[in-house]
Amino acid sequence: MDVYAIDSPHFSVPIAEVFVLNRAAFQSATKHNEGSGSGFTLGEVACTVGFFDGVHRGHQHVLQSLHTAARERGLSTLAVTFAQHPRSLVRNVAAPPSLTTLQEKIELIGDCHIDAVAVLNFTPEMAQLTAQEFMQIVLREGLGAEFLLMGYDHRFGRPKADEGFADYVRYGADLGIEVALCDKEEAELQLSSSSIRLLLEQGNVAEANLLLGRSYKVSGTVVHGFQNGRKLGYPTANLEIDTAKLVPHLGSYATWVEWRGQRFAGMTNIGRRPTLNNGTQISLETHLLDFKDDLYGESLTLEFIGRLRDEKRFEGLEHLKTQLAQDAEKTREMLSKAL
């Protein structure tokens, strides 16, 4: 995909990077300073703003509604988002673990028929903009917004007492931006990224998957471990993942494992190796059923389908081996139902 920087005379650094997913939608777009990757002008777009962590069913509803509204108006679609959680800058608190990496988020937004994603360079200066200033400087002047679709519970800009949707409509009228409110079709499901994080932190991947509208995924690179699984006849791929990515609660899970365009059944353990390593190190390791190849250095994606059991301590290796055989049988059964 093409990536361009968006400049603004109001800031000393580009206000955003735009990831163009559908180049045909921006035939009239202009790129300045050829070769520098900066000064890209989109033209007129329909946009929506949000962090979109997880791109769950509520987000999908907003994005698909934006697609419909944009086509009715003959506009390209743009999702405006952030690389880091705004809370970490605005409130100076630690950001929650992410349901999606930035790359995953961009790809999932693209699956909702969005033409481009603008990732804001959310500086302290940008955080001080009021909603009206944000709409003018970032959305209208910077990104060319002509239509803005707002989620039913979304707000942006430096908080202002009693500011509401009617104010956004008024600001938009002054700036030449049509502002609309997305309907509440998904609201009754009480969808939120926070509720999905909580479910995953409890190990309830099945319920989390329902709210996501797909299976939760974690990707990483296979690194060398202690090879204890190999000694038991269950060799595992130990994954090193993005440290900001949320990992489900400790325990064992039935997973699909994606590797080089292929999919394999797998049983994944997230734990502290209580039996073999005295609980000193958290690990994420997967045994691929009916698979023999060496995966060191390879990239894998785990698709979490269901929880097998809690983390537990075993009296010895034979007890652990018996449990792993039971886990494998249960994994096959669980995945067969998920086909």
Describe every region a protein language model picked out.
Residues 1-45:
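Positively charged, low-complexity intrinsically disordered leader regions
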Residues 38-101:
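N-terminal catalytic cores of NTP/NDP-binding nucleotidyl/phosphoryl-transfer enzymes
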Residues 56, 109, 148, 208, ...:
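Residue-level signal for inorganic ion chemistry
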Residues 88-175:
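N-terminal Rossmann-like or analogous alpha/beta NTP/dinucleotide-binding catalytic cores
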Residues 170-271:
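Glycine-rich, Lys/Arg-enriched anion-binding loops that position phosphate/diphosphate groups
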